[in-house]
């Protein structure tokens, strides 16, 4: 008898937005046209901050990828990342393949108990790691900005995600 084939799991970023912050997004750009990045009010780290990053498991190969991708953000932002074993690190990364890919947004990490992850990298294909680090430094999805200029075909979106 043939073994049943499992349908592939959808790989999406799961928002970790605290309830009090829903719908308080603010664009980081004031230029006309589409906004490329947004930061929820009060979620970005202080300019020049060094954010400590701790791994909660994972392999040496996974750690290497994370460090490379964090380095990209360090080059393009006014933030630095220090990889430590300290339990009170601001960013704590787990690698649970059953929990998807997600990150709390920016300074929300401060309110998460020190023994819990603030980011999970259940898969690391494509730009997933860099994407989640964008959230960790305080950026949200640009489509969440009401002024972002995206015209949704709501019926098509619902149909796509309902199947």
Predicted regions and their residues:
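Zinc-dependent metalloendopeptidases
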Residues: 1-163
